Amino acid sequence: MARYIGPKAKLSRREGTDLFLKSARRSLADKCKLDSKPGQHGRTSGARTSDYGTQLREKQKVKRIYGVLERQFRRYFAEADRRKGNTGENLLQLLESRLDNVVYRMGFGSTRAEARQLVSHKSITVNGVVANVPSQQVKAGDVIAIREKAKKQARIIEALSLAEQGGMPSWVAVDAKKFEGTFKQMPERADIAGDINESLIVELYSR
């Protein structure tokens, strides 16, 4: 399955909620009708969505939020299921501790896609070592930084400025002047923002 490169607003409309694929700080709610499906007049249907359909829709939504494809998502779920504790929460923690997501949460990228690009273009270091794998798992205490050559990029400066205004997650500590941040700890479920019902995904894979 190829990565989707079409209009981001269409994906949010399909899920009926803002997935913040265009910006973490600017909602699409004022720009388009999120409760209307994509299409010239919005697709309508009188049929009730089945439990399976609802569960599948939730999985698709989470995949789109984090920019993860099906095979990789299945691996994340398998790992989450192997770990102790709540499988759904474990899944979200694995997704949140991806390097591209941490770069995004620290405000270095305005979207996860932009953060993923920064990692792929070798603009990021982890504990002083250049990293270029977006799916790399970040551990507590790891220091994420922007490489010197990338610190003057306008998009990074703007994204960081907006992130500072909106506030950072409690599980990261960012020094904007140094363009670096520390992954303090794995986020708790209450710390993970977003309209996500992970229990539906667990139910889907438990069928």
Swiss-Prot record:
Gene Ontology terms describing biological process: ribosomal small subunit biogenesis; translation
UniProt xrefs under Gene3D superfamilies: Ribosomal Protein S4 Delta 41, Chain A, domain 1, RNA-binding S4 domain
InterPro entries per UniProt: Ribosomal_uS4, Ribosomal_uS4_bac-type, Ribosomal_uS4_CS, Ribosomal_uS4_N, S4_RNA-bd, S4_RNA-bd_sf
Compositional bias of kind Polar residues: 42-53
Region described as Disordered: 31-55
Role of this protein: One of the primary rRNA binding proteins, it binds directly to 16S rRNA where it nucleates assembly of the body of the 30S subunit.
NCBIfam families xref list: PRK05327.1 (NF003717), rpsD_bact (TIGR01017)
Assembly and oligomerization: Part of the 30S ribosomal subunit. Contacts protein S5. The interaction surface between S4 and S5 is involved in control of translational fidelity.
Descriptive protein name: Small ribosomal subunit protein uS4
